[in-house]
Amino acid sequence: MFWETALGENTGRSEVEKLNDLDADLQIYDPYIYAVNYQGKVAQIDPTQGRPIWSADVSSVAGLAVDDAHVIVTDEFDTVHAFRRSDGEPAWTQEGLSHRRLTAPVIVDGLIVVGDFQGYLHLMSAEDGSMVGRLRSGVGPIAGTPVTRDGMLYVQSRSGKVAAVRL
């Protein structure tokens, strides 16, 4: 093994309290690796040594997205957090989507987009997290992370339907 690093410690009295799972996909945004886990942290990791450059306390089962300025995380309570990519300091927080069972975020043309359990896509400003709009995908509860390509946003429902949306 070349290296390994832990994003959080398994603390607590019961087995449930000790859960510290990686449920989200890693992201690579040159030259760093970004990771977030449940009951742990979000971190920027040096890929040559496995050493965290910075980390911040946040718990996520959904995931994260990265752009030049920010690391965006959907937490376990459906709050969307932006951390400055340069130093991990909080940039903004969007708390207006609680109880929506949000997907991991995706960044598209200066917007942060998350899907929810009712099939809505919520659009936020990447600059300050303010709500910009909301679209109904038409496919039902959104599963997984929306993906983008050539100006289109693609989402998949829990029932297997796929929709394409131009933002």
Residue ranges and their predicted role:
Residues 137, 141-167:
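Blade-level signature of beta-propeller repeat domains, shared across WD40, Kelch, NHL, RCC1
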Residues 102-126:
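C-terminal hydrophobic structural anchor segments
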Residues 46-49, 84-87, 125-129, 167:
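Short loop/turn segments that connect beta-strands within beta-propeller blades
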Residues 2-28, 53-67, 92-109, 131-149:
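Extracytoplasmic beta-rich repeat domains
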Residues 1, 43, 81-82, 122, ...:
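WD40 beta-propeller blade core
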Residues 40, 78-79, 118-120, 160:
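Short coil/turn segments within WD40 beta-propeller repeats
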